[in-house]
Each structure stands twice: as C-alpha cells, then as structure tokens.
From Swiss-Prot:
Domain of life: Bacteria
GO biological process: translation
One GO term describing the cellular component: ribonucleoprotein complex
Species of provenance: Malacoplasma penetrans (strain HF-2)
Taxon lineage: Bacteria, Bacillati, Mycoplasmatota, Mycoplasmoidales, Mycoplasmoidaceae
Name of a matching Pfam family: Ribosomal_L10
Name the record gives this protein: Large ribosomal subunit protein uL10
Family annotation (NCBIfam families): PRK00099.1-1 (NF000955)
UniProt keyword annotation of rRNA-binding present: yes
C-alpha cells in the first residue's frame, strides 16, 4: 500500500512541475468523448507543442495544490488537463475547437501566463485569432488610411495631367 501512495505523490509532484513550467494550461471535463476523438486531440496538441493528460481528480488536485493553484476548487467528473510550453493560446484553441464539435465537453477553467481564467473568459480568449493573425489585422488597420491618402493624391495628380 505504501508503494502506491509514494507513486501517486511522485506523479503529482511531476505534474506540478510540468504545470509550473508551462505557459498555459486548461482543465476540462471530457465525459462522453470516445477514444478516437481523444487520440485525435492528442495528435493535434502534439503538433502545437502541447500535451494532454487524463488523471484521477485526487492526483490532479494534489498537483494543483503543489503548484499553489487553488482557483479550481473541487474537481468532479472525468477531467483532463492540457498544457502548452511553446504557445500560450494553442492548448486553449485546440480544446475550443473540440467543444464546437462536441457539446459534452465542459471547460472548468485555464491559466494563461499565471492568470486564472474561468470557462467564459477561456472561450473568448480561445476564439481570438493567433498572434500572426492579430498582427496582420493591426497592420491592415494601420495601412488602410495611408493607402486612402495615396489613392487620393494619385487621383489629384492624374486630374492635373
């Protein structure tokens, strides 16, 4: 009996360290998902540098406590945690895309760069475009007025000729 307790303690410590070193993580309830969907999610997450882990609630609770994260409270039901070490938003986006197809998924919350986000805020952040998309939107907003001025100057110069 002592070996299993030691194993669970080591596992929760290892998960806690991975949570601390990640840029973001999300916890969600996966009740109703089949194995093929979870496997596809794992593959998609691997491409983004993220990892999915299904844990017993007690082990997940201990890992969160060791990481000094108390906002999730009691975890009930079958829960999974996804964390990312490369991109902050990628794990949230992948789970968000999965919730579009499967209404049985319930997001419990997430942590992004040390800030707790509830389910609603997590969904709104995950629905935003990625960083490159936001940069292109900003660039088009900045170049739009300049382009208008250039077209007006070109039209004025053509009318004078």
């Amino acid at each position: 009996m002592k070996k299993i307790i030691q194993f669970k303690d080591n596992l929760s410590s290892e998960i806690s360290e991975q949570i601390k070193s990640s840029k973001s993580f999300i916890i969600f309830e996966y009740l109703g998902l089949d194995a093929a969907t979870i496997t596809k999610l794992r593959k998609d997450l691997f491409k983004t540098g993220s990892k999915l882990l299904v844990l017993k609630n007690n082990i997940l609770r201990r890992a969160l406590e060791k990481a000094n994260i108390k906002e999730f409270g009691d975890l009930v039901g079958p829960n999974a945690i996804v964390w990312g070490t490369e991109d902050e938003i990628a794990p949230l986006k992948e789970v968000f895309n999965l919730t579009k197809d499967n209404e049985c998924i319930k997001i419990k919350g997430s942590y992004v760069e040390g800030t707790f986000l509830d389910a609603q805020k997590t969904m709104s952040i995950a629905s935003l475009p990625n960083r490159e998309g936001l940069y292109s939107m900003l660039l088009s907003c900045l170049t739009g007025p300049i382009r208008g001025v250039l077209y007006a100057l070109k039209a004025v110069s053509e009318t004078k000729n």
